[in-house]
Structures are given as structure tokens and as C-alpha cells.
Amino acid sequence: MDGPSPNHGDRRGQRPRLIVLHYTGMADAASARARLSDPLAEVSAHWLIHENGFADMLVAEDRRAWHAGDGSWQGQPDVNSRSIGIEIANPGDRPFAARQMDTLENLLGRIMSRWQIGPEGVIAHSDMAPGRKVDPGPRFDWERLARQGLAIWPSDRRGPALPLHECLTRIGYPDVDPAKRLAAFRLRFRPWAHGPESDEDRRIAASLLPV
């Protein structure tokens, strides 16, 4: 089934291996839907979750939506070709509504099952584009998703601190300016942390590495 947005193309021989979460950064879902469906805007996403929790399919999942932009993950550019994009209606300055998170959990579970994507494949827009993007932002509840097996979160049983650069590379972060990389990592896992890189950053990053 095709969605209403014309902004999509072929997946260039790839299949979805990632799910990228965004906030719309716009006043409401109606405004976001209009932009994501405007051929002149040249942006789109596969799904838009409205304020009331309605999941709106804008682009079929087997098509390449234009949501990620410049960036990379796990050393590979062209994230659009190998990802599914989910936009959540939120201006970026407030918590996400419970009904939106309920819908997101349900939607993620179905997409992950459909495309055989593990929790490590659910990432933030800010993860793959450090310094360029900040969504879904510091108010997004990643820990809630992790409790349902829908994302990764630091283990309570943390081992020794390991070099942060090495850990972030192994997790998937792009090799960009270290300060931007640290900011992107903290935005997701320590959103209210400030200051220079610390042992706590290193311990958390080490706990996220695949066993």
C-alpha cells in the first residue's frame, strides 16, 4: 500500500536494517504532514505519529523515504536506503505524549519483526548526524523503549571504563569532531550531562557494546 507522500525512491539494492526516530520540530502533526507530503520540500518519512497517537503511513516501508539526510551509521553513508524513518509530532520543546509513546512501542515492535531489526538498530536522528541534528531530543524516553526490547540502554552492571572513541565507533557513531560526537552520545544516554568527557561517559559507552 502506498502512502500519500510522493517523496520517495528505490532503495538502491538495500533493505531496512535501521529505524531512525525523529521529532517533527513543527507546530503540529497537520503542518508536518503537509511538509512531508510536499514534492517541493523533498523530505518525507515512512510514518508520522500524531499528537493523539494515530500512526499515519506516508511512504511504504519497502521504498526509500527522504528523512535522514547527510550522516552515517556503522561506517555506512546513505542511511535513507537502509532505514525506516518515524516522525513523532513534537515541536522539540516538550515531553512526548503517553499515547504517542504507546503507539510508537506498538509500531516499532511490528516493524522490527517485519524486517528483522534488533534493538541496536533503533537509533536517533542525532546519533547518525552529530552536530547537525538533535532530534528526538533530550526529553525522549529511550529507557522506556529499552525496557520493551525496542532500543538499547546502558546496563546497570557497568564494567571498566574503555576509551570513548573506540566504544562510540563500535556502537556505530560517525567519526566526526569528538565534541560533536560526545554531545550526540550524551543527548541520547546522558541528556543533562555537561562538561568534558568523563569516566561515566566511558563506562556507559562500554556497557552498550555488543557482548
Predicted regions span which residues?
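Active-site-adjacent loop/helix surface patches within enzyme catalytic domains
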Residues: M1-E120
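Basic/polar, cationic surfaces and motifs that engage anionic cell-wall
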Residues: P77, G92, F96-V211
